[in-house]
């Protein structure tokens, strides 16, 4: 079959019309040096600070330094795949992370990729990891409580939704234990249908051992807490760049809940290692070192992260993001650079002491220097009523106890005060992974402050508390329910509680 010239011309015209010759302009640079997770790149004249670039091997990098004739990038991943002379292209985009409820129950890395072997995460929503903190008009004051389930904290150092409360102390003093107990304690609220009672949790492990994190994830799974928790990992074996961006990625995940009228709690464990990772990056990028070799902007590193925790106004949905940053001190030195920085940014601190921990007082909270600057506005009235005098009584007890070491010749009133103080300390002790509902905490502290324990031997106080709570749960659940619904101790509730306690103490003391 012969084609006529006119037909050939028509076919050619059709094919030419269908050709898609849209060319995409790419800006490409070249790696001039690479080492220790840092790449120096030449030829990216229009690249921006904080922009993501892609290396020839597919590994991503983050631009942090803009110099006269080159740019410095941190490599996010295996930097052994990046070689001198490799091409680098701009993505014209900043770092983003996957957000949404699909992440709940999952363990992800600093870039939001799942690492728990449970398959892909189905979510279409992404957020920038660096977001501007809400302004003054968008916020409202802290007014709702975050119940940690820990008596010493909920009674004396209350935490509110939208607050930043620092947990600070030496290694092995129970900092992570407080954070994990707080996550586990949210399970009761998640069993309710009311969305405003629920608090979604995010745990960020920065520079931790993989074995430690595996234990934490196992504990959360066993307690049924992973259903409402996201775990973000940047362990000690990972690049400093991933340890640096992990808290910002996790914060964006938390902001999804905050900005959609929900409530979230984020735990940064810990920001000391985060600052060390940033110091490492800064020194490798040849930035001038300052105090303790940290760069000049190390305060801004943490302030821009923690300022994103907020209680939003009703116009903005009324959601909240509460932050519990953790800082590890060396030999109890809270006046070091990073601890003082974070103390000044946060709304209070829970200070844990090694001496108390070794004495068996756990949680090892030093009530004297621990403080919550805004949490008292969120504390429920019933707790305020019973715990109002506890801090003063404990302070007086510590003073008299230290005084009693110099001589045994004490008057009966001082001896009684010391004995009462010892029982208060005993009632505030709590075992790990056993958070206590707020109504039961109120009853326990009421027992301690109203001197019902005076006739109970010190070594039997915990046993007495356990038996008393078991009895009230079994036979007088109505008292607990009344405290829970009323959220204050009315005269009627107090009469019922007094009658129950008098009968129980009498019966308990009779039993041999």
Curated annotation (Swiss-Prot):
ATP binds at residues 169-176. It is a peripheral membrane protein. It is found in: Cell inner membrane. InterPro entries: ATP_synth_asu-like_sf (IPR023366), ATP_synth_asu_C (IPR000793), ATP_synth_asu_C_sf (IPR038376), ATP_synth_F1_a_nt-bd_dom (IPR033732), ATP_synth_F1_asu (IPR005294), ATPase_a/bsu_AS (IPR020003), ATPase_F1/V1/A1_a/bsu_N (IPR004100), ATPase_F1/V1/A1_a/bsu_N_sf (IPR036121). The record marks 370 as: Required for activity. It holds the Pfam family ATP-synt_ab_C. Its main location: membrane. One of its GO terms (molecular function) is ATP binding. Its EC number is 7.1.2.2. GO terms for cellular component: plasma membrane; proton-transporting ATP synthase complex. It catalyses: ATP + H2O + 4 H(+)(in) = ADP + phosphate + 5 H(+)(out). Keywords: ATP synthesis, ATP-binding, Cell inner membrane, Cell membrane, CF(1), Hydrogen ion transport, Ion transport, Membrane, Nucleotide-binding, Translocase, Transport. The keyword Electron transport does not apply. It is an enzyme of class 7 (translocase). PANTHER family: ATP SYNTHASE SUBUNIT ALPHA, MITOCHONDRIAL. F-type ATPases have 2 components, CF(1) - the catalytic core - and CF(0) - the membrane proton channel. CF(1) has five subunits: alpha(3), beta(3), gamma(1), delta(1), epsilon(1). CF(0) has three main subunits: a(1), b(2) and c(9-12). The alpha and beta chains form an alternating ring which encloses part of the gamma chain. CF(1) is attached to CF(0) by a central stalk formed by the gamma and epsilon chains, while a peripheral stalk is formed by the delta and b chains. Belongs to the ATPase alpha/beta chains family. Produces ATP from ADP in the presence of a proton gradient across the membrane. The alpha chain is a regulatory subunit. This is ATP synthase subunit alpha.
């Amino acid at each position: 079959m012969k084609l006529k010239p006119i037909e050939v011309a028509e076919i050619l015209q059709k094919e030419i019309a269908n050709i898609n010759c849209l060319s995409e302009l790419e800006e490409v640079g070249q790696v001039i040096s690479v080492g220790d997770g840092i790449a120096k790149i030449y030829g990216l004249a229009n690249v921006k600070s904080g922009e993501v670039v892609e290396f020839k091997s597919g590994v991503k990098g983050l631009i942090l330094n803009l110099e006269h004739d080159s740019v410095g990038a941190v490599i996010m991943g295996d930097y052994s795949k990046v070689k001198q002379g490799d091409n680098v292209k701009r993505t014209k985009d900043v770092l983003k992370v996957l957000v949404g409820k699909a992440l709940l129950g999952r363990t992800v890395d600093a870039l939001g990729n799942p690492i728990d072997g449970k398959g892909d995460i189905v979510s279409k929503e992404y957020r920038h990891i660096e977001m501007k903190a809400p302004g003054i008009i968008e916020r409202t004051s802290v007014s709702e409580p975050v119940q940690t389930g820990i008596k010493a904290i909920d009674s004396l150092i209350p935490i509110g939704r939208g607050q930043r409360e620092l947990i600070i102390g030496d290694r092995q003093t129970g900092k992570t234990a407080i954070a994990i107990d707080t996550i586990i304690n949210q399970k009761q609220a998640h069993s309710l249908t009311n969305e405003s009672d629920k608090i979604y949790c995010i745990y960020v492990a920065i520079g931790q051992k993989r074995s430690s994190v595996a234990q934490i994830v196992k504990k959360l799974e066993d307690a049924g807490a992973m259903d409402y928790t996201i775990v973000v990992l940047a362990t000690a074996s990972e690049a400093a760049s991933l340890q640096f961006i992990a808290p910002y990625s996790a914060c964006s995940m938390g902001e999804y809940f905050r900005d959609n009228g929900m409530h979230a709690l984020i735990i940064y464990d810990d920001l000391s290692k985060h600052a060390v990772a940033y110091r490492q990056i800064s020194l490798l990028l040849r930035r001038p070192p300052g105090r303790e070799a940290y760069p000049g902007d190390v305060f801004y590193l943490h302030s821009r992260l923690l300022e994103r925790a907020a209680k939003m106004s009703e116009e903005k949905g009324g959601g909240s993001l509460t932050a519990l940053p953790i800082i590890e001190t060396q030999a109890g030195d809270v006046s070091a650079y990073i601890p003082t920085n974070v103390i000044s940014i946060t709304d209070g601190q829970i200070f844990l002491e090694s001496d108390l921990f070794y004495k068996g007082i756990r949680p090892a909270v030093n009530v004297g220097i621990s403080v919550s600057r805004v949490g008292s506005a969120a504390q429920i009235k019933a707790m305020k009523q019973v715990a109002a005098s506890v801090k003063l009584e404990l302070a007086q007890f510590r003073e008299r106890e230290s005084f009693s070491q110099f001589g045994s010749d004490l008057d009966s009133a001082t001896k009684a005060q010391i004995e009462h103080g010892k029982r208060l300390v005993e009632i505030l002790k709590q075992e790990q992974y056993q958070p206590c509902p707020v109504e039961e905490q109120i009853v326990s502290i009421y027992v301690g402050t109203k001197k019902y324990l005076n006739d109970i031997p010190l070594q039997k106080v915990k046993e007495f508390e356990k038996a008393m709570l078991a009895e009230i749960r079994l036979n007088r659940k109505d008292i607990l329910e009344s405290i829970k619904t009323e959220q204050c101790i009315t005269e009627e509730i107090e009469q019922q509680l007094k009658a129950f306690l008098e009968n129980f103490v009498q019966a308990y003391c009779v039993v041999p």
